[in-house]
Amino acid sequence: MLSTVNNNIVIALDAMGGDFAPLSVIHGAGFFLDNLVDPGIKVFFHIYGDKEEVSPLLLKYKKVSNNSEFTHCSDNVLANDKPSFALRHRKDSSMKAAIVAVKEGKAFGVVSSGNTGALMAISRFILGTLPNIYRPAIASICPTKTKSLALLDLGANVDCNADSLFQFALMGSIFAKIALKIDNPEVALLNIGTEEVKGNDSVRGAFELLKNAPGINFKGYIEASEFLEGNIDVIVADGFVGNVMLKTAEATASTFINLIKQEVFNSWIAKMLVGILLKSKLNKALTRFNPKIRSGAMFLGLNGIIIKSHGNSDAISFAHAIKFAVNAISENLNQKIINGVSHIE
């Protein structure tokens, strides 16, 4: 059941998390309300932060103020806080208050640009995991040459056993159905080869669990070289490998895009030719890889919707992270995960 106020979907916002907070958060909430709300859906915010910094922004962004409730918090989690320190000592932080709001039923989900490790630690401590879920995983949507795919885990679990990878695959499949709107997503395990004998014990063990598992369209192994080809819908890895692969792919894409801009737009003649011949196709390709519209990573498996926006998110990026949360809530993602793993003993 959705957490609502007057039939609105309620989202808790950590106003102090991120490099450009609280402006990116409040402006982002305003951008979301103005541009990204789907017809028939109403969204209400619980905003947590420092009143001296947030209150002036709420006076400026009237639409946010009219669709929110603000709570002052005397502390905030810093970017360099260790998760254990944030959990024990940031008792009145905006991040913790937002998560507690979910625990108490005041909101159904949280959006934060704050410290990833702290957000996971506090969320797991306060909310716990869904029934039958051993470990939560961080999942995100990534662009490829032809379409988008879901990738998990992105850093929540450095070491994973076969059972955890198996659960990540189940959760990733359900996540992809909602986030990518695919009826029967194809799922693969990231490995150093496609042969069944390749990989470590955890990966091979997960393969054995998945190859005959009901309710999942498992396609075996995939190599990192195929990541951007768009031949699969969900890629599953442990948190160490997944995080390294994602950051490598992001850096490669960023370098390539900047190289294209540098080489193509280095003269007015090139700009004119591109404008005439390739502008629409180039803009379409650049939009597909635009990080602003893919700002949110989701903590799957927790007893509440938690969205982590990039630490350097601007208002537009944060707005898209809010939309990510709203979609997950409106589609009842967590209940579908519970149903999808209910057969696990």
Swiss-Prot record:
GO BP, sorted A to Z: fatty acid biosynthetic process; phospholipid biosynthetic process
Top-level taxon in the UniProt lineage: Bacteria
GO cellular component: cytoplasm
Annotated pathway: Lipid metabolism; phospholipid metabolism
UniProt EC number: 2.3.1.274
Role summary: Catalyzes the reversible formation of acyl-phosphate (acyl-PO(4)) from acyl-[acyl-carrier-protein] (acyl-ACP). This enzyme utilizes acyl-ACP as fatty acyl donor, but not acyl-CoA.
Oligomer status and interactors: Homodimer. Probably interacts with PlsY.
Protein name: Phosphate acyltransferase
Native source organism of the sequence: Wolbachia pipientis wMel
Lineage: Bacteria, Pseudomonadati, Pseudomonadota, Alphaproteobacteria, Rickettsiales
